Amino acid sequence: MDVKIFKLSDKYIRFEIDGITPSQANALRRTLINDIPKLAIENVTFHHGEIRDSEGNVYDSSLPLFDEMVAHRLGLIPLKTDLTMNFRDQCSCGGKGCSLCTVTYSINKLGPSTVFSSDLQAVSHPDLIPVDGEIPIVKLGPKQAILITAEAILGTAKEHAKWQVTSGVSYKYHREFHVSKKDFEDWQKLKGACPKSVMSETDTEIVFTDDFGCNDLNVLFESDGVNMIEDDSRFIFQFETDGSLTAKETLLYALNRLKDRWDILVESLSE
């Protein structure tokens, strides 16, 4: 099995895997969607009552939104994730919550103001902050305040969408478009628009591949003078993450997760 990276950034990856079957490709896709651990807020405690600032001014910590709505918004905020942490139900603390499986956050802010995700302060793990600090949570009016504590734990998208790391996970066969220069007049225009996609060229034919994602090649699907060949052992994958994990971390975890599952199956069959 060979892997070739076409494009890689912190949140996006496009790559080719050669030497696998369609069922293996689909297993990788499902793992990328459902089985990647992610940190997300699970429990939120609202502290209601009067709050005084340093000058003695009194604020009311009741919010203009229902507590459940604010808690739901907090749960959907992407958080930086440490894959060395434990799932709470598998932790040595017995599910009580400790520094190995739980991250504690707090928000303490006075109105009038808008509470953003950047106001979510990590108490126990300072590095595990929100991915984006500009996500609005709730707007506070004069004399209003918010004082909460929250617990974040690891989970997967099998349990809830807030634990889904990836989006747009897709794959397709490696495709080659054998274009007749005689029958397809715009081949030179495509060559100029998609230079990386040119695989080979002769006096009568030019061969393109859409592995690099050049959208100009879409015209070839319905054009005369084009012979498309698909290889069902080579797959082009792409996906992006919400920033809780990098695209590279996500892919490596998914591949190792699949390997572990196959190893367990082989062991069980050999017993």
UniProtKB/Swiss-Prot annotation:
Keyword terms: Cytoplasm, DNA-directed RNA polymerase, Nucleotidyltransferase, Transcription, Transferase
Keyword Ribonucleoprotein: no
Catalytic activity, reaction form: RNA(n) + a ribonucleoside 5'-triphosphate = RNA(n+1) + diphosphate
One GO CC term, this protein: cytoplasm
Residues forming coiled coils: none
Intracellular or extracellular location(s): Cytoplasm
InterPro entries to which the protein is assigned, alphabetical: DNA-dir_RNA_pol_insert, DNA-dir_RNA_pol_RpoA/D/Rpb3, RBP11-like, RNAP_Rpo3/Rpb3/RPAC1, RNApol_insert_sf, Rpo3/RPB3_RNA_Pol_subunit
Pfam families cross-referenced by the UniProt entry: RNA_pol_A_bac, RNA_pol_L
Chief place of localization: cytoplasm
Subunit note: Part of the RNA polymerase complex.
Protein name, per record: DNA-directed RNA polymerase subunit Rpo3
Encoding gene, per UniProt annotation: rpo3
